[in-house]
Amino acid sequence: MTNEEPLPKKVRLSETDFKVMARDELILRWKQYEAYVQALEGKYTDLNSNDVTGLRESEEKLKQQQQESARRENILVMRLATKEQEMQECTTQIQYLKQVQQPSVAQLRSTMVDPAINLFFLKMKGELEQTKDKLEQAQNELSAWKFTPDSQTGKKLMAKCRMLIQENQELGRQLSQGRIAQLEAELALQKKYSEELKSSQDELNDFIIQLDEEVEGMQSTILVLQQQLKETRQQLAQYQQQQSQASAPSTSRTTASEPVEQSEATSKDCSRLTNGPSNGSSSRQRTSGSGFHREGNTTEDDFPSSPGNGNKSSNSSEERTGRGGSGYVNQLSAGYESVDSPTGSENSLTHQSNDTDSSHDPQEEKAVSGKGNRTVGSRHVQNGLDSSVNVQGSVL
């Protein structure tokens, strides 16, 4: 049944109509009533079907709306959370800014202790004082300009200001002059001290030059003495060969004394080389010792020995010659060591003199004891290189 078709009229029957009306008419009315009921039922079914589809559509729409609302709610919740987070960050920043704007005592102390800030404050303080002075001066000038030319107070005030300005200028000049005088005095002292240092440096340079010259001279003398020492060494080797070739006891006795003297003389020259030309006293003592040995040998020559003692004397002379040669070698090695260092120590000199004295025979010392004082007195006249040259001349 469509909406365009008109609905049948509703049939209404009362009890009187049932009693009065005929059967055919009642059936016709009943049919009309049935048609009306069917029309209502069809309309109701149509309405029900339309309502279900509408409800379903509305339900779907409501579900979509609910989903959209839920999504919007989630978005809004997220936005709210972000806003709350931003609010918290803002509150923390506000608190931090408040703390920064209201620094603590420690921060204030640290800022005041900072040298850069202190310098900045000092400059600001100086500028403030200057501006204050300028302001006071301007105010004084302004107040002075307010006075009339005939005003006595204004004249007195300006005269007082001029007097104070002059006094300040004089005080500043005095302070600057005193400081300049102090600086000039200090500068003069420094100049004097520098001149003294320069003079002392020049003296030291001259002294060093003199020392260099002396060292060069000593090196030249050492070279000459080394050459002489080599010559004496060669001569000693020749004398030793001659001594070995000699066969007669008397000749061996006489020739044995000469190498001993020569070995002692060369040993003394070697000991002189250890300390250079300056140690003349030690060389004189050593030459006196050599004088002792030579005079001891001459005394032995004065007294003739028995034939039985000839071999003994030759043996003793050979022993003395061997000892003299060994002592000469030791002295020569020590002399070369001392030549390497021209300023030899006195300990090496005393050690060499002790070695030389220890090589003497007790018999020779006994023989020389009688003439020791006279020989020492004669030998003390010699000095320096002259003693070594005389000894070498006597050996040659």
Curated annotation (Swiss-Prot):
Keywords: Acetylation, Cell cycle, Cytoplasm, Developmental protein, mRNA processing, mRNA splicing, Nucleus, Phosphoprotein. The modification Phosphothreonine is found at residue 350. Induction: In smooth muscle cells, up-regulated after serum withdrawal, when cells become mature and non proliferative. Belongs to the fl(2)d family. Component of the WMM complex, a N6-methyltransferase complex composed of a catalytic subcomplex, named MAC, and of an associated subcomplex, named MACOM. The MAC subcomplex is composed of METTL3 and METTL14. The MACOM subcomplex is composed of WTAP, ZC3H13, CBLL1/HAKAI, VIRMA, and, in some cases of RBM15 (RBM15 or RBM15B). Interacts with WT1. Also a component of a MACOM-like complex, named WTAP complex, composed of WTAP, ZC3H13, CBLL1, VIRMA, RBM15, BCLAF1 and THRAP3. The gene is WTAP. Ubiquitously expressed. The modification Phosphoserine is found at residues 14, 305-306, 341, 388. This is Pre-mRNA-splicing regulator WTAP.
